[in-house]
Structures are given as structure tokens and as C-alpha cells.
Amino acid sequence: QIQKYRDGSDPDNYPNVNHLKWLLESGSGFQHQHNLSIQGGNATTSYNLSVGYRNQEGMTAKTSNERMTALFTMKSEIAKGLMLNLNINAYNNKYNAPNGEPQSIDGMIGYAVRQGPIYAGQKSDGSFGYQDNYSPEAWLASESFVQNVSRNISASGQLTWNTPVDGLSFIGKVAM
């Protein structure tokens, strides 16, 4: 029997599984990020436009994060002593992960650490080995994953009038 644990000849009945290693190697962890910025202007106006994209695959299967961002800023002297500042910032974020505790990715890692190597992962018949009714392999195979999407757009503007009176200016601000 001990030999079967050592050589892995009967992994369903005599498993020797490093559950944490299996879990952390189930995803690629690959990430790529791209950014593009355009800046310009003239004597009275300057602007900056920046867009970004990041796609990050999780170290565990079925976990990922995709994020797109955009930023626009402009500063312009629209008349002598009258300055306009505009800022617009937006993002879209998609996060895929296990659903809820203790089945969240943190819970899965915690149970993978606790799960002894003598409990099978996924067996040849498709069932799973369990300790205390928890199996990281079973959670990862389940459909209980969610996609959280968050989006935000914020904008602000400021109009500054530097009056002819030395040291006196008026500032108006708006934001959403």
C-alpha cells in the first residue's frame, strides 16, 4: 500500500496530491498591459489623452481581471485671464472569481493548504476526494463562479478668472 502512495500507480485509492501546488498551477498567471498617450497643445491650450488596457489571467484557473481605462485632461486660456481646466476619467473592470466564502479564492487556497495529500483531487470517475466536505478541485470544477463588473466615469471642470485687481480671482468648480 505504501508503494502505491509513492509511485502513484493507483491515484484514486492511494493518492499523493499536493493540493496547493495543483491549485496554484491551474492557471497561467499571464498578464499583459498596453497604454497609449497623446499630448499636445499650443500657446493657450494643452491636452492629454491616455487610454489603457490590462488583461490578467489568475494563477488559479477561472480567475481573471480585465480593465480598460481612459483619461482626458485639458487646460486652456479661453480669454485673457480666464482659464478652463477639464478632467474626465473612466474605467471598466471585469473580475472573474469563485463565488462567496469559503469558496472564494482565499478560501480555496486555505483549504488547499489544509487538505492532506492522502485525499484525492479529481478521481478517474469524475468524483472528488474530500476532507471535511471541502475540496479545492471540486470548487474549481463547479459552476459557482461570478463575474463582477464595475464601471465609473467622473468629470470635473474649473473656471478661473484672474481679475485685473491684483490678487483677486474667482474660481468656479463643477464635478460629477
Explain the meaning of each model-derived region.
Residues 1-16, 58-65, 69-154, 169-176:
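Surface-exposed loop/interface segments of Gram-negative outer-membrane beta-barrel transport/assembly proteins
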Residues 119, 161-166:
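Short secondary-structure junctions and interdomain/linker hinges
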Residues 31, 42-43, 77-79, 164-166:
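Outer-membrane beta-barrel channels and translocator barrels
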